[in-house]
């Protein structure tokens, strides 16, 4: 089922999401809905708070293969990269955001197994962006102000 994307101003987007304690059918259904919603909206990632659920679940589109990450935790970061990001919860806006170039993170899959992942480039950026959502942060909170320019006449 495609779910409504919560937009900037919705309090759930500024709230730290709760850890998933049990991976039951409700969590699996939410994950399926999140994948369907992400694809419908042409997104590359989606966090549960963006569809109104305060749970630490994200989905990312990796080479057209959606991955569900439950209770993701970034454990290593290296390098730094500045690039523009958009967000389904902040429509029509792109802002420059500094992110780690490479990350190591762990998360549970839908079977409850904890796995360790290494990511770089776009995948690393998407995972960091979605984990920010779980911590109540939006791209507007991370925008690099010195790179924002206004047109002067």
From Swiss-Prot:
Fe cation binds at residues 87, 129, 133. Transmembrane segments: none annotated. The active site is at residue 130. Its EC number is 3.5.1.88. One of its GO terms (biological process) is translation. Keywords: Hydrolase, Iron, Metal-binding, Protein biosynthesis. InterPro entries: Peptide_deformylase, Peptide_deformylase_sf. It catalyses: N-terminal N-formyl-L-methionyl-[peptide] + H2O = N-terminal L-methionyl-[peptide] + formate. Removes the formyl group from the N-terminal Met of newly synthesized proteins. Requires at least a dipeptide for an efficient rate of reaction. N-terminal L-methionine is a prerequisite for activity but the enzyme has broad specificity at other positions. This is Peptide deformylase. It comes from Dictyoglomus thermophilum (strain ATCC 35947 / DSM 3960 / H-6-12).
């Amino acid at each position: 089922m495609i779910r409504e994307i919560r937009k900037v101003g919705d309090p759930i987007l500024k709230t730290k999401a709760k850890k998933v304690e049990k991976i039951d059918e409700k969590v699996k259904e939410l994950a399926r809905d999140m994948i369907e919603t992400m694809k419908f909206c042409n997104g590359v990632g989606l966090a549960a708070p963006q569809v109104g659920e305060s749970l630490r679940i994200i989905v990312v589109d990796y080479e057209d293969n959606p991955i569900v990450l439950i209770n993701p935790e970034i454990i290593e970061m290296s390098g730094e990269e500045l690039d523009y990001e958009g967000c389904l919860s902040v429509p029509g806006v792109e802002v420059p955001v500094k992110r780690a170039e490479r990350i190591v993170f762990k998360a549970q899959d839908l079977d409850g197994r904890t796995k360790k992942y290494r990511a770089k480039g776009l995948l690393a950026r998407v995972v960091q962006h979605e984990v920010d959502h779980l911590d109540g942060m939006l791209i507007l909170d991370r925008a690099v102000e010195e790179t924002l320019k206004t047109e002067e006449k």
